[in-house]
Swiss-Prot record:
Residues 1-21 form a transit peptide. The keyword Transmembrane helix applies. Essential component of the TIM23 complex, a complex that mediates the translocation of transit peptide-containing proteins across the mitochondrial inner membrane. Has some phosphatase activity in vitro; however such activity may not be relevant in vivo. Belongs to the TIM50 family. This is Mitochondrial import inner membrane translocase subunit TIM50. Keywords: Membrane, Mitochondrion, Mitochondrion inner membrane, Phosphoprotein, Protein transport, Transit peptide, Translocation, Transmembrane, Transmembrane helix, Transport.
Length: 353
């Protein structure tokens, strides 16, 4: 009993101590100063505005890294493949390697320099004409060489592309093509110089010229590529520039020699069009007047929106002036004739013995 009473008294004293400690812990904190309250509020605001972790935000970042790695590997593999393919020596028909100026370099340097040369030559092929002399030398006697050269664009000048769901792409012939060729072939060496590719333009030229009036054909690879335009450089034609006329629907096509060109409006497919007939009359007038330098004539029409219409108006005005001059001359002749008749009546000639 004594032991039980002692144990019970110890438990009661322990509970009292525990209750006293609990009351101490649950007691209210001491009052804070206004500065402490402001500091605590600022800390809480900065934590609330700080970066918050969003679930799943690591997923897109990981995917981007994987995509960049794959793109880098593909780019590196493509670069190595290009250098390997275009960096080897060219081979002949028997499969034997053809030596070049890069054989003395280390292998990697050889590959890189050959690849660079290949793409440089390819770019040069696109920008520059295929040859500094696009046409052969003029014909000599006993063969006939027309005194002038006429350079014609195909699309927009002679043909108009049309597309329909039933037929697809078709090219419509401009009215007056046959007349143009027949009247100008004896006076002009006719050359088709088009910005179209040879694969597209060759059969079209065959269709518009079944009688063979066209002397030569030049395609896109013969143009000079400048600022997004295919320019026709007359200096590469191997002909006297003073006797070359370029007909195109884009002034940029003859920008290097602006006074050698006649810019027409692009044909829209109208079947009542008569521009080629007017062009034939204009060029025929130049040739029949034996103009030494066509640039002196074409310079007057270079600033006109419609050179052929300006030529027709000037021609009509000259015809009216000529008719007026002839009328005045005829009137003066009639007056002179009537005066002579009156004088002969007043003073008859003496009869011969």
């Amino acid at each position: 009993m004594a032991a039980s009473a002692a144990l019970f008294s110890r438990l009661r004293s322990g509970l009292r101590v525990g209750a006293r400690g609990l009351c101490t812990r649950l007691a209210p904190p001491p009052p804070r100063t206004p500065e402490q309250v402001t500091e605590i509020a600022n800390r809480g605001g900065s934590k609330a505005q700080g970066p918050q972790h969003q679930p799943g935000s690591e997923g897109p970042s990981y995917a981007k890294k994987i995509a960049l790695w794959i793109a880098g590997l593909l780019g590196a593999g493509g670069t190595v493949s290009i250098v390997y393919i275009f960096g080897n020596n060219p081979v002949d028909e028997n499969g034997t390697k053809i030596p070049d100026e890069f054989d003395s370099d280390p292998i990697l340097v050889q590959q890189l320099r050959r690849t660079y040369k290949y793409f440089k030559d390819y770019r040069q092929m696109i920008i520059e004409p295929t040859s500094p002399c696009l046409l052969p030398d003029p014909l000599r006697e006993p063969y006939y060489q027309p005194p002038y050269t006429l350079v014609l664009e195909l699309t927009g000048v002679l043909l108009h592309p049309e597309w329909s769901l039933a037929t697809g792409w078709r090219f419509k012939k401009r009215p007056g093509i046959e007349t143009l060729f027949q009247q100008l072939a004896p006076l002009y060496e006719i050359v088709i110089f088009t910005s179209e590719t040879g694969m597209t333009a060759f059969p079209l030229i065959d269709s518009v010229d079944p009688h063979g009036f066209i002397s030569y054909r030049l395609f896109r690879d013969a143009t000079r590529y400048m600022e997004g335009h295919h320019v026709k450089d007359i200096s590469c034609l191997n002909r006297d520039p003073a006797r070359v006329v370029v007909v195109d629907c884009k002034k940029e096509a003859f920008r290097l020699q602006p006074f050698n060109g006649v810019a027409l409006r692009p044909w829209d497919g109208n079947s009542d069009d008569r521009v080629l007939l007017d062009l034939s009359a204009f060029l025929k007038t130049i040739a029949l007047n034996q103009v030494e330098d066509v640039r002196t004539v074409l310079e007057h029409y270079a600033l006109e929106d419609d050179p052929l219409e300006a030529f027709k108006q000037r021609q009509s005005r000259l015809e009216q002036e000529e008719q007026q001059r002839l009328a005045e001359l005829s009137k003066s002749n009639r007056q002179g004739l009537s005066f002579g008749s009156l004088a002969s009546r007043l003073w008859p000639r003496s009869k011969q013995p």
